[in-house]
């Protein structure tokens, strides 16, 4: 009797092949480049003669190796906006000296100020890029800016209350400004006419504050006191405490150390002008502290005199 035929293993029924992974565009990205360009032109009320300039201004260096990024335009825009603001501030502030004028110019074209311009006018979704981490950082900053009072300009030049502005946002504004500047044959007056309203409200001598840490030190020095900053980590946050005359007068926190210090200085300055005012007017500040303050002022003046005369820096013992 012949043996039974060998049984073939049952074949597994295979389903259709899995589809190739689909690369989704970054959140908020405007894939239609004609629409992206049109949005900028509508925003500026300006039609580009050379559309390639605008496409270049809206291309990040991470997008593709063969694409021309905004880096060269950003270089030009940084200088062009600086000169445009110099002219404007010079003409509108006839009594201000070069120091205050420089401070106002720096405040109006700071990374923090220009980044908020980009957020206010929704420019980041128009940028061609390929950097998920950049999207994350910008997204966090946008959410933070939404919580800021719209009419509070005092914190803008030096940093907000939570996160530092990603430079890419300021770069976009500078690159777009440069695209206009080059497109109109380097006509500075035309550039200012087209872009000025983007920067409203412009920071003026009436609305600007001093750098918070500098303001705190100057306030303390007037009363013969010294502010001390103590930094420590709590989870993923940096916490900064400010002590004056041994008393805690300010606290600030952020994921970024520089912002935490700014927040602490702001908090301390507010409290020393209010609830903690007695810290500046009691203790060593009534006697020895006054002498210390005067001595510090004398040392500062001597250092300044030596610097002006190119003399060796004095050594205090």
UniProtKB/Swiss-Prot annotation:
GO terms for cellular component: cytoplasm; nucleus. It holds the Pfam family Ribonuclease_3. Its cofactor is Mg(2+); Mn(2+). GO terms for molecular function: metal ion binding; ribonuclease III activity; RNA binding. It is an enzyme of class 3 (hydrolase). CDD domains: RIBOc. Coiled coil: none annotated. Residues 16-26 have a biased composition (Pro residues). It comes from the Eukaryota. Residues 37-185 form the RNase III domain. The record marks 167 as: Important for activity. Residues 211-274 form the DRBM domain. It comes from Oryza sativa subsp. japonica. Residues 1-26 are annotated as: Disordered. This is Ribonuclease 3-like protein 2. Cleaves double-stranded RNA (dsRNA).
